[in-house]
Amino acid sequence: MIKQAVILAGGLGSRLKDKTKTMPKGFLEIGGTAIVEQSVQKLLAHGIEKIVIGTGHCNEYYDNLAKKYPAIITVKNENYANTGSMGTLEVCASFVNESFLLLESDLIYDSAGLFSLINDERKNLILASGATKSGDEVYLEADEKNCLTGLSKNRDALKNIFGELVGITKLTKSTLDKMCAYAKIHHSDLPKMEYEHALLEAAKTIPVAIKRIEYFVWREIDNEDHLEMAVKNIYPHIVENEKLRAVRREVLLNPGPATTTDSVKYAQVSADICPREKAFGDLMQWLCDELKLFALASETNPDEYETVMFGCSGTGADEVMVSSCVPDTGRLLVIDNGSYGARMAKIADIYKIPMDIFKSSTYEPLDLQKLEAEFATKKYTHLACVYHETTTGLLNPLHIICPMAKKYGMVTIVDAVSAYCGMPMDLKSLGIDFMASTSNKNIQGMAGVGFVICNKAELEKTKDYPMRNYYLNLYDQYAYFAKTHQTRFTPPVQTMYALRQAVLETKQETVQKRYERYTACWNILVAAIKKLGLKMLVKEEHQSHFITAILEPETPKYSFEALHDFAAEHSFTIYPGKLGNIDTFRIANIGDIQPEEMRRFTVKLKEYMNGIGVGV
């Protein structure tokens, strides 16, 4: 797995004349986006966690780009005017601690090249193409094993031409170190050394393979002719190629699984791996560390919390908590104000856990005074509740409920399946001890991984609790992973890779910005509902902004099935209500849904409703 990249962007770009006098050539725009930003987006879509950009000329452009993409680290080559690309790579080297991709900043290319390098088992690998006739080629010479033996802009200086250097290379950290050591020796006599020169020297002692893709679509933009060729011929070809690999877009307006990006879908396509390998254990540990951060404020110490993962659904994670976190001597109070609270009560009942149910309206806010009176009886050691009731979109005020429960000495167990990563939260200030969620809701991954984020002190107390469940036992799973770096049973490997990509994309967007995007979509939906004269089940001030339960129109012409099928014809999936005594349908705006897509849906909703005489 390649997780780091370096982009060399220190050059003056003088051959592009006035176009790069006041900006770096990486900021030439093609298709409305700077070419270096296109490269950054492609790297992120291929699972790159850290992008080190070596800057020089007009470095502030890259510093501003880093504000948009948290994965970017910029490092300025202060002597950029007097050094070659190797000088810029040298200043980046200390920020690289493992194998990485090395790219030039002035490239446009088909993203298939990244996949090809990342997926290849060879550790040091140069991407090459067939003949481009660009007029500024760097030719590569190879031996019988397709390993680099020479490179030059003068093809007559080489014995054979294996391909042309693209400017994207996969290297190990040790190879980078050899390149830097060689460059250091020659600072005085070769001050303007290019990275290719140092790589060729390293190739004398380390195999550096060449991967030639004969018809690879790319262009390095060094002069105005290159730019014209890129705009007219190369870029349209790249766009066409990448569109061919795009997955058909279906906008899921159901409450989960949610719509995912193509990059999350494609993250599942990886080389087979035994989940007992250390590399996969490292991946799971990284996920555990990252997942809890989305539920904690920056000032909260993450060492006080642990993430425990299972191959299961969100309901599975709920069952983990309920069955594992209440001792035989305890008593559980379950708040039931929707199907998911009722589900937690059902789980407790099946395990015969001593329990009472606090029943409340499915669409009106909880009576907090009545709830506190129940807490004050001091009958209960544990509280189980749902943060966001997916049945209706009702958001329970956990910032009041859980601290109130803690006041009465209760351990709090929370289903945050439909709240986590959709809104900022801090388990510590909320007073949540155990929180369940899943990979397929607001974190925007694929279905298959359930997890519990635990207050570590409370988790340790469960060590001696009765083991009511084998597969879903919380402490056993936690202790086994801590000891072996493995789960007790086979994890959903490909789903874990997709979850990793979803985590990276959540870090890029941030939970706060995701909440704002979800809210923008919700505002569009609510405005359309009101304009049509439809009614929402839950008052706006008590809604989550994630899911909206809409009362079905009172006309015999209405049919949910007909509305569902009409929406499906236009690539939208909607979901029926789950309240037995109230007829509703639900529209969710979670996942990778954009405001423009919600606008398109509301147009279709209006079209259907007007067709049956509603909102006319």
From Swiss-Prot:
SUPFAM superfamilies (alphabetical): Nucleotide-diphospho-sugar transferases, PLP-dependent transferases
GO MF annotation terms: 2-aminoethylphosphonate-pyruvate transaminase activity; metal ion binding; nucleotidyltransferase activity
Region of interest (2-aminoethylphosphonate aminotransferase), residue spans: 250-616
Cofactor, how bound (note): Shows weaker cytidylyltransferase activity with Ca(2+).
Activity-regulation annotation: Cytidylyltransferase activity is inhibited in the presence of EDTA and is restored by the addition of Mg(2+) or Zn(2+).
First-tier enzyme category under EC: transferase
Enzyme Commission code(s) on record: 2.7.7.107, 2.6.1.37
Database matches in NCBIfam families: PhnW-AepZ (TIGR03301), PRK13479.1 (NF010006)
Protein family per UniProt: In the N-terminal section; belongs to the LicC/PntC cytidylyltransferase family.
Physiological role: Bifunctional transferase involved in the biosynthesis of cell-surface phosphonates. The aminotransferase region catalyzes the transformation of phosphonoacetaldehyde (PnAA) to 2-aminoethylphosphonate (AEP). The cytidylyltransferase region catalyzes the activation of 2-aminoethylphosphonate (AEP) to CMP-2-aminoethylphosphonate (CMP-AEP). Cannot use phosphocholine. Exhibits strong activity towards CTP, limited activity towards ATP and no activity with GTP.
Protein name per the record: Bifunctional 2-aminoethylphosphonate cytidylyltransferase/aminotransferase
Originating organism: Treponema denticola (strain ATCC 35405 / DSM 14222 / CIP 103919 / JCM 8153 / KCTC 15104)
